[in-house]
UniProtKB/Swiss-Prot annotation:
Top class in the EC scheme: oxidoreductase
UniProt keyword RNA-binding, yes or no: no
Lineage: Eukaryota, Fungi, Dikarya, Ascomycota, Pezizomycotina
Keyword set, alphabetical order: Heme, Iron, Metal-binding, Monooxygenase, Oxidoreductase
UniProt cofactor(s): heme
Protein name, entry field: Cytochrome P450 monooxygenase AOL_s00215g278
Protein origin, superkingdom: Eukaryota
Function of the protein: Cytochrome P450 monooxygenase; part of the gene cluster that mediates the biosynthesis of sesquiterpenyl epoxy-cyclohexenoids (SECs) such as anthrobotrisins and arthrosporols, metabolites that possess a novel hybrid carbon skeleton consisting of a polyketide-derived epoxycyclohexenol combined with a terpenoid-derived monocyclic sesquiterpenol substructure (PKS-PTS hybrid). The SEC pathway plays an important role for fungal soil colonization via decreasing fungal nematode-capturing ability.
GO term, biological process aspect, one: terpenoid biosynthetic process
Entry similarity comment: Belongs to the cytochrome P450 family.
Organism: Arthrobotrys oligospora (strain ATCC 24927 / CBS 115.81 / DSM 1491)
Length: 585
């Protein structure tokens, strides 16, 4: 090797090192200037929280950095930092603050008025669509991955799918699935133990199973018995629909964070996830075809798929209307990729978010015997004189479940499945909001995080914010049961100060806020209310005490485990909390 070649390699090495040092420093400088221009307080972090590389390695990197006493470098981008911080970060830095990193600028919002303003300005603060397309774009365009006119179309159609007839399907299948789950717990047939004490060893996976079965029937008309074993794999497939759906949804983070080439050349887990996604897509296309044929024969499946296929799709009609193109347009004149994309979103949201909300609600329920007594009174009143639980009519019973709905609302306040709601400015050049009577301009390509966990634990809006107190919701539930909108009662006054506070918009984000709130809110409520009825008609739930423990000891242990929840796609509980189902009388 010549001296010249040696010098060239040396220069190249120095250049690469300099580039990788200077680039992040320059990025930090640029984003610091942007933060200063907003006039908001700001802090630094060494890594951009939404960097794809960081998302892939942070769970491994964080313990190493912590062990090396370098955790302070990523204080505001470490795993689940905002869930751990709760409202403390806003107490220290203000209701709105910036996080400056080499890769971008993030603005965390914990002010209710600004939260409402941001959610109303959909075009100025759109969702980070690029990220959502990466997660679910494989299945087609959807309400989650669209904006502007396209989003309005998706929202209009998906709103029509969540109808009362569909909610009845959800109600009865939830009663069935929850009753079967309860019987399995009591019989000890949970593949873990043969004892008959009703100890529940796999609450999380059972909640996921229940939610998947319910949403599969409600979305696609496919009923899965609770005790169903491994399904037969159809010819030409590598997985059954249930197997593909379960694996895909359990490993959705791989779709979110991993490049597609890993599906073919990566580790076995990534390859299996790729196979699951491919098979799930093929199964869904087949189900769309079947439902389309049924509609042509005058049959209405009364499911979300059927409702979407009967929607008015101007774009498909512009391309030929109902002139049938088997590749892209259904016989009813609707784009198949649109139906596919939204069906996948229903499956993801109806499975993951409902299951996690139910899991947290059940654990909190078990920890609070006093709350159980209040709920039992309501359940007993509803069930008085009822012999068969399936005789209950959804439209008559659901509005009466005021206190039980309060349990769900309070559980999602303490443990929202999405601790922050992501917005962005992307390439928008005129994004601003009013904060403390001043206009605050947000630069393009910024991430705006509506900090649900921060505002949910703010004692200005929630007295005793760390306390599980469903009664704070009872007044709200009464108003909703009467059909009175919270917006109509903003000046609510009286002795119930909790209820008065609750009517301030932007203080509760468990189901989103504004025009882009969760369209499946009632779906989740119906599913979870029916589950509570089936589980607690004759039983209560208790914490399992370790030898020598009191209830208070077990409560503290369970609460600590809940507080160690971690964010993946949604908030997840990774630690086991033992509870048991026992007869009430």
């Amino acid at each position: 090797m010549t001296i010249i070649e040696n010098i060239s390699y040396t220069h190249l090495a120095i250049g690469l090192i300099a580039y990788n040092v200077i680039k992040p420093l320059y990025g930090l400088h640029v984003n610091r200037k942007k933060a200063i221009a907003t006039g908001l307080p700001y802090v630094y972090t060494a890594v951009y929280e939404w960097s794809m590389v960081w998302l892939l390695v942070k769970e491994i990197a964080w313990p190493v950095l912590k062990a090396l006493r370098l955790g302070w470098l990523v204080k505001y981008s470490r795993p689940s930092w905002n869930f751990d911080a709760k409202n403390k970060v806003h107490e220290d830095l203000g209701d709105i603050f910036c996080v400056v990193s080499p890769g971008g600028l993030s603005i965390f919002v914990g002010d209710p008025d600004v939260i409402c303003e941001v959610t109303k300005k959909r075009t100025k603060f759109p969702r980070p669509v690029k990220s959502f397309v990466k997660v679910m774009g494989y299945f087609g365009p959807s309400i989650l991955s669209s904006e502007h006119d396209e989003w309005r179309f998706h929202r209009r159609v998906t709103n029509k799918t969540f109808t009362e007839p569909n909610h009845k399907v959800v109600w009865f299948d939830s009663l069935y699935q929850a009753s079967a789950m309860r019987d399995e717990w009591l019989s000890g047939l949970d593949n873990i133990t043969s004892n008959k004490e009703g100890i529940i060893h796999k609450m999380g996976s059972d909640c996921m199973k229940l939610a998947l079965h319910v949403v599969t029937l409600a979305s696609f008309g496919v009923q899965i018995p609770w005790t169903a074993q491994k399904d037969a794999i159809p010819t030409g497939y590598e997985m059954s629909f249930r197997e593909a759906s379960e694996f895909f949804l359990e490993h959705i983070a791989i779709m979110a964070y991993c490049p597609k080439w890993l599906y073919k050349y990566g580790p076995k887990l990534a390859q299996t996830a790729g196979v699951a996604a491919k098979n799930m897509r093929r199964h869904m296309m087949e189900l769309i075809q079947i439902e389309d044929e049924k509609l042509q024969n005058g049959e209405d499946g009364k499911n979300l798929l059927s409702a979407m296929l009967q929607s008015d799709d101007p774009e498909a009609q512009a391309k030929g209307g109902s002139a049938y193109d088997t590749a892209s347009v259904s016989k009813t004149g609707v784009r198949k990729d649109f139906v596919m994309g939204n069906s996948a979103i229903f499956l993801l949201a109806g499975h993951e978010t409902s299951a996690r909300s139910l899991e947290y609600a059940l654990f909190l329920f078990a920890m609070h015997p006093d709350v159980q007594e209040e709920i039992f009174e309501e359940i007993d009143e509803i069930l008085e004189g009822v012999g068969n639980i399936y005789d209950l009519k959804y439209e008559e019973v659901f509005p009466k479940m005021v206190k039980t709905n309060g349990v769900l609302y309070e559980a999602t306040r303490l443990f929202p499945v999405t601790p922050y709601i992501p917005k962005s400015t992307e390439d928008v050049v005129d994004s601003w909001f009013i904060y403390k009577d001043q206009r605050v301009d947000i630069p393009p390509e910024s991430m705006v995080a509506l900090n649900a966990i921060g505002v949910h634990y703010n004692e200005r809006y929630w007295p005793e914010p760390y306390r599980f107190k469903p009664s704070r919701w009872y007044q709200t539930q009464k108003q909703e049961a009467l059909g009175i909108s919270p917006q109509d009662t903003l000046q609510l006054s009286g002795s119930n100060t909790d209820a008065a506070r609750l009517y301030r918009r932007g203080t509760y984000l468990g189901f989103g806020e504004g025009p882009r709130n969760c369209p499946g809110k009632r779906f989740a409520q119906v599913e979870i209310m029916a589950t509570f009825l089936a589980l607690f008609r004759e039983h209560r739930m208790e914490l399992v005490l370790e030898p020598g423990e009191t209830h208070r000891d077990a409560f503290d242990r369970a609460w600590a485990a809940l507080q160690r929840s971690r964010m993946v796609i949604t908030l997840n509980l990774f630690e086991q909390i033992k509870v048991k189902l026992v007869p009430r009388k």
